[in-house]
Design a protein with these regions (language model features):
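Extracellular, repeat-based ectodomains that mediate carbohydrate processing or recognition
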Residues: 1-206
Length: 206
């Protein structure tokens, strides 16, 4: 076996309440990582493809025993073996913000009402609590001809019951081994319910 690190967290064996100040400015840094929902696909050429939800974290209270996560974080991350190991330096890329430069975002929960943000009735609380990105819970499969399909659960901002915004399963595909990806399609519209069905944890036959 050969181990490859596709997101190299900037501090090895980080302990909660230690505080991350990577550039020693006196301000704790926010970091991007995964949301702990992911899947691995081995293609027909035995190449690994990884899909995972994106998430921001901040540990700025050094006495509470937990870190903060940000539920409005969006983006489905993608990596394959051709991209190589993560070599991102352990210093912030932007002011007090670190993120890996290796995985790429291939899909997101969409701005369906065109107000330049993805948010709804439950954006300040009351949302279904999965501790997940707005685009998360991926599942992937591949055809005999090498076409890759990926489903993910997407926050669907224009479908709500005035309390909760619902998630729907979206699907994307790549016809060129992961180089480019299609636009997402909602495959669980549930029109008969005005879309008000929570669609999560889809599973695709590999």
């Amino acid at each position: 076996w050969i181990r490859t690190t596709f997101i190299d967290f900037p501090v090895d064996k980080y302990s909660l309440d230690s505080g991350l100040d990577l550039d020693s400015t006196g301000t704790f840094d926010m970091v991007y990582s995964t949301d702990n929902y992911g899947t691995v696909l081995i293609d027909n050429n035995d190449k690994a493809h990884i899909f995972t939800g994106n998430m921001r974290y901040l540990d700025d209270d050094l006495a509470d025993g937990v870190s903060s996560w940000f539920p409005l974080t969006n983006g489905l991350l993608y990596w394959n073996e051709d991209m190589g190991a993560d070599t991102t330096l352990p210093t912030p890329q932007d002011s007090d913000l670190w993120y890996s430069e290796t995985p790429i975002v291939i899909a997101q929960a969409r701005d369906l009402n065109c107000d330049i943000e993805v948010a709804g009735y439950d954006s300040t609380g009351g949302y279904a609590l999965y501790y997940a990105s707005l685009s998360s819970m991926p599942s992937a499969g591949i055809t005999s001809s090498g076409d890759i399909y990926v489903t993910f659960s997407a926050y669907t901002e224009d479908v709500d019951n005035s309390i909760q915004v619902f998630r729907h399963v979206n699907i994307i595909r790549s016809l060129d081994g992961g180089a480019t990806w299609s636009e997402p399609i909602d495959i669980t519209p549930h029109d008969i319910w005005n879309g008000q069905q929570e669609c999560v944890f889809a599973s695709m036959v590999k």
